[in-house]
Amino acid sequence: MVKLRLSSICFAKKKNKFKIIIIAGPTASGKSSLALHLAKKYNGIIINADSQQIYKELPILSSQPNIKAYKKISHKLFNFLDFYKNFSVNQWFKLVKKEIKEAQKKNLLPIIVGGTGMYLNTLLNGLKVLPKIPIGLKNKGKKIIEKIGPKNFYEKLKEKNKTCVYKINPNDKIRLLRSWEIYEVSNKSIYEINKENKVKKLDSYNFYKILIFPPRKLVYLSCKKRWDNMIKLGAIEEVKSLMKKEKKLNKKNLIKTIGFKELKNFLLKKNNMNTTSELTLQATRNYAKRQYTWFRHQFSANIIFKETYEKKNKKYFLKEIQDKLLTN
């Protein structure tokens, strides 16, 4: 039996605010399928909180909903951006607020689904106003961290200001660079700026948070099945098409979706298919590990399911959600 950890929130006291469901969890845990079934049952719309599923050219590699799903339920913030365009968490926050308001007008239940920590953190804790970073400074930071390595970069950043590395893993290049950039521009850490600034929050809504949090082994098995299915669905052709666009537009090394770089090297005959699959699955496992760490420390759920969502446990999931969240 799945053990549930319920928060201390008293749902009966939250009736006056508009209800929003968040379905979160590591990659390949069944979030999208659960969102679809909930949306069908409770007159909902599905809003994307995955940073890779926004791109038009990557429906297969980013595991976007299929055409059948789009036809059954309205999906928002999926498959709308060209691969070479920048898109910040601030932009996502503005769009998601708009979609929530539209759903409220139509009396639809917003179901926000995804595993991108930055998106979910902003949604729940508000938009933090940080200074703009010049491109030249970004490039400088990248060169430094490549030269000295993330651990040395971490130590040097810590010497400047201890709060610059607050809650940052020494191997997390992205967050280390972001922290360094902010400090170079403002002479303050992100932690210090957040304490000073007012944060724009969505206080007029009730967020009911569902976390699918199965053992890693189950997720790794799902990742393997999903990768095999991606190849069958045409992931290689998807990458081939994008490589042509990259060359035509001279927009290289912008795509971060797992599997793209690996299949690109396969098409360039740098690796065989077995090696390509091994590298992709290892990258996926590494990503899942980071997600597990983030959800464990940064996401307080109302319900936690300790298994992947599948057809065989559909009734159980839906009943628990109805009884614990949606009856009040």
Predicted segments, located by residue:
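Phosphate/pyrophosphate-binding catalytic cores of soluble transferases and nucleic-acid-acting enzymes
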Residues: 2-328
